[in-house]
Amino acid sequence: MVRALTFDVGNTLILASPRFWLLPLLEARGLRPRGDVRKAALEAFRFYEENHLKARDLETALGLWREFHRRLLVGMGLEDHAEALSRELVARGKDPATWPLVPGAEATLKALKAKGYPLAVVSNWDATLPEILEVVGLGRYFDHLSVSALSGYAKPDPRLFREALEALGVSPEEAVHVGDAEADLLGAEAVGMRALLFDPLGENPKALPRLERVLDYLP
């Protein structure tokens, strides 16, 4: 029987694709990408994944985000604006508009808490995540945050999942993990949890198309 749930954050609760948070800003400034946006995003996120475990404090984390944005903007062909915009984007980190929520994210978490489920985050993120979750209004729904940079290991390392399970006081068989990536599936299954794959972009026919569908898998 399911007694608790854990959630990824990027592209599970918060929309990570630049189309949602960066392109509208560029359009408002009259700037149009000249490079391949998808390729630039993949390379920038790869850089982030390779370096985020070192961002254990806020100063290092903010520096990581500046470099992430700079690389993303350069990859989009906006070299002349990359330095200034990367600093501006980091400065806007406490603006909820910088972190658009996946449709149904808060409603799903609210419904789960109303049913009495303990909830935890299991996310590959830097030291800024706890503050970001408060900024977007989701922090109050979670009983524990397992954040890779703060824990020292990243998904699919099962230790990040075990940390969350121990904090929630449940066995792997009593918990379900929700995420959008292969690392979510591999890590959860490695500790014996059930994993639900979610795709906010609707591109994966094997994934849940709406986060609210998580409720269909619970008693």
Regions found by a protein language model. Name each.
Residues 2-103:
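N-terminal helical cap/lid subdomain that shapes the substrate entry/recognition surface
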Residues 28, 108-117:
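A short, Lys/Arg-enriched amphipathic alpha-helix followed by its capping loop at the start of a domain
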Residues 1-7, 35, 79-83, 106, ...:
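Asp-based, Mg2+/Mn2+-dependent phosphohydrolase catalytic module
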